[in-house]
């Protein structure tokens, strides 16, 4: 049975870095669905209610369940705008969902953003506009990740939870 890992949180939390490390750790037959890549690079659409990114992510999620051992879905993924995606995840993966939410202070996400190669693309004012405090899904239990948990520790924690 295919397993789904969901990584969510505000911009600059570390979702993409953890997702890529997990894909490497799990190896072959691990599908990575990056919300930003699909929305900004593949579709070139804005985020929000009714975004075509949600529809494409649903199709890709279904493909992943049928064809991959592990599917990693990562992104801000606003709990209201992507409700249909989360409902699909529950239908497709049932109890094989491992969901994590980065609950970090704004200052920490800003600090982390400053370490990224693309930090020049947007700054503090944009991050403040996008900020959503404690944007939990509700219908899917999410384990909270805090600033005290480092990259390797996070990857190890998720990997061991999914494998065992």
Stretch-by-stretch model annotation:
Residues 7:
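Hydrophobic anchor at the beta1->P-loop junction of P-loop NTPases
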Residues 52-94:
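Glycine-rich phosphate-binding loop used to anchor ATP phosphates in small-molecule kinases
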Residues 115-157:
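Small-molecule kinase domains that catalyze NTP-dependent phosphoryl transfer to phosphate-bearing small molecules
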Residues 10:
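P-loop (Walker A) phosphate-binding loop of NTP-binding proteins
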Residues 16:
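Walker A/P-loop
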Residues 20-66:
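Conserved substrate/cofactor phosphate-moiety recognition/catalytic segment
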Residues 13:
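ATP-binding Walker
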Residues 93-112:
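Conserved phosphate-donor/acceptor-positioning beta-strand/loop module used by diverse small-molecule
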């Amino acid at each position: 049975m295919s397993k789904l890992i969901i990584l969510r949180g505000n911009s600059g939390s570390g979702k993409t870095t953890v997702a890529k490390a997990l894909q490497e750790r799990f190896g072959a037959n691990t599908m990575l669905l990056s919300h930003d890549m699909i929305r900004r690079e593949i579709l070139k659409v804005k985020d929000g209610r009714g975004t075509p990114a949600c529809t494409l992510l649903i199709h890709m999620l279904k493909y992943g369940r049928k064809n991959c051992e592990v599917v990693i879905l990562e992104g801000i993924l606003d709990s209201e705008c992507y409700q249909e995606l989360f409902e699909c995840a529950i239908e497709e993966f049932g109890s094989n969902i491992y969901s994590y939410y980065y609950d970090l202070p704004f200052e920490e996400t800003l600090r982390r953003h400053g370490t990224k190669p693309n930090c020049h693309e947007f700054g503090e004012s944009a991050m403040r506009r996008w900020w959503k405090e404690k944007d939990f899904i509700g219908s899917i239990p999410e384990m909270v990740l805090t600033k005290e948990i480092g990259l390797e520790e996070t990857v190890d924690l998720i990997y061991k939870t999914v494998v065992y």
